[in-house]
Amino acid sequence: MDGTYYPAIKLMYHTGMRIGEALGLTWDDVNLQTGEICVVRQRLRRNYFDAPKTETSTRSFYADASLISYLRSLKATQAANEIRYGEAYQLVYEDVENDHAIVILPKKIPMPHGCTPRPLICVKPSGLIYVHDTLKNALRRLGLNSHSFRHTHATRLIEAGAKPVDVAARLGHADATITQNLYAHDTEEMRKETARIFGGLVDK
């Protein structure tokens, strides 16, 4: 896979966000000073914006320093791309008066009436948005799917000692039990740890 989709992969891996949440994240949703990320929308496959999947999916959390450093660099790269492409650079808008449809227009065309700018983080160098299915197909060729990153993020946090309730809040789950049942009940490290604990009891 080339680097085209790296921003989305990086976001999903470091945050556990759903693919629609990552693709719908804008620079306005990220505080590059504090590291706080707010999930307030998702991008649907049919090129519309919508509220996150559930009520608890609307959330905020803090990203790690590595991701924030990468995002700072990415924002600078996008600014340079906008200069390089000039008036041909593509800008993304949300048509709030037309079912929140996504509108993409070259920079030289004024923003349409009823639209709001949506400076997406996950865009191609030209400013064009990713196609959901193309990204999913690229992941599939690597034996992955968009949920792989969500699963990995959660299991690694729980294995490292994070509280399930905190991981659930980070992922946007309504109940920590969901997080435990879906991600953490059968991880390899946890099975090994169980064996070590049992071995310690037997040896006493």
Residue ranges of each PLM-predicted region?
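C-terminal secondary-structure termini that scaffold catalytic or DNA-interacting sites
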Residues: 34, 47-48, 52-67, 73-81, ...
